[in-house]
Amino acid sequence: MLACYFVVEMKRGVSSLQLSKIVGVTQKTAWFMLQRIHNCFSIEIKEPCLKGEIEVDETYIGGKNKNRHSKDKVKDAQGRSLKDKTPVFGTLQREGFVVAYVVTDTKGKTLLPLIYNTVHPNSTIYSDEWYAYNGIDKEKFDHQKVYHKKGAYVIGRRSTNTIEGYWSHLKKMISGTHFWVSRKHLQRYVDCESFRYNTKHLSESERFDVFLQNTKRRLRYSQLKKITA
């Protein structure tokens, strides 16, 4: 229970090394405990759960060539290259929740079904100019773009600043606390950061109670909304 509390309540999470010292076990055992705890952060999605003004965006998690020795640098790994990075896609409701997924790529055929699965029709969707978003159903959604390449980041209500702030917290948690996370286990860490974002307005005791409820059964987003309202 002590391990659960520290993982849930620490702003940037807890590394396996830190956890091993807190509970008095080996780092290997602490790492296993950490994965089991992270499993309890995922929320089940059965139907669209976000509505209103929605920001969608993708980011890339992975090592940076500038931090590597010359012999270890990955060739052509800049920008949206997936050679050395793992893409993560997110949908975020302003003044609401975020839903984020580790994805295989950032093509329209991958991202659009995730949007349709999480966002209610008639919502306004804000995105950057990434080509995958061109296929968003304009009959069901009001799709508005922000053209970052032209130096535009906020035009009236149009922006993706909120979800970019979420990405910043996610990357700080990974690089600052865990230093490195494999593709295989990345979704658990994404779920962990999403849980913190979605319960940020709760007190420590309220947040921990939501976590405990999710250890007994996998909560749906509709249930999480009722609990955190």
Tell where the protein language model's regions lie, with residue ranges:
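Residue-level recognition of single "structural anchor" positions
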Residues: 1-229
